[in-house]
Amino acid sequence: AREMAKEARERGLLLMEAMISTLSPNFMKLQEKISCIGTVRHYFAAFCQYSSKIDLLRKIISGEESCPVPSSFNPDHSGGATQDIGIYTIYPMVTLFGKPESVKAEVTAIEVPATEGPRRIDTQASVVFRYPGMSASVLYSKAADSRLRTEISGEKGSISLDQIHITRQAEMIVRGAPTSGRSEGAKPEDITAVCDPDEYLCEFREFIDLILSGRTESVNNSLDNSVAVAEIIDQIRAQGGIVFPADA
């Protein structure tokens, strides 16, 4: 990622990571409203989705099946939960708050067949990050389901999203506001933005806008953000003992 970013900048080329989470109308709404909740003290995001391939993977490991390991769990393809879905919890965090001071990961992994012999591949992880004056934590899994909401907590209130990878609903609670607070009967404010029927259009729209305006970097999906996220993912993999053939 670092080499690609350097090459793109030196040659004046447009390069943008196709990260939908940080280009969606609801993420933009979050950025617009985040000052309303005061100084942020914690960020939490979860993306847990039981993979349709994990049952097949278990049969391959046990010898019941002899087919190739699915790409999403294949070390030869640099697969695993962190690379596949964990990034959707981490990229928005970096876009909002920058690179953390520290990363502490608890990684669950299994051994799967690979070209150069069995290798560990991560199926889920929980990660804690430290920032000046705040903390962040993420949870992601391809081996379990969860309906946990994403929440950004501040001194004056909080903002929650139904899901972090493609946000379709967002709400805000500001302490003392007429529509919110902790009093009986108070309701959070719905801050959901109008979205396209096809959520992925926001990625194409951002890229086209960059081309038409002559810019070579997205603000939210900047090269600095992409490099920072790649470095965080490397730290998580290192702490979990996840090594790919492509790392050589």
Describe these PLM feature segments.
Residues 10, 206-248:
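C-terminal helix-rich "cap/oligomerization" subdomain common to oxidoreductases
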Residues 89-169, 205-213, 247:
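Contiguous beta-strand/loop segments that form the cofactor/metal-binding neighborhood of enzyme cores
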Residues 150, 167-184:
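Short polybasic amphipathic segments
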Residues 191-205, 221:
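Active-site loop of classical SDR/Rossmann-like NAD(P)-dependent oxidoreductases
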Residues 21-106, 115:
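Predominantly a Rossmann-like dinucleotide-binding segment in NAD(P)-dependent oxidoreductases
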Residues 1-22:
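Beta-strand-loop-alpha-helix segment that lines the small-molecule cofactor/substrate pocket
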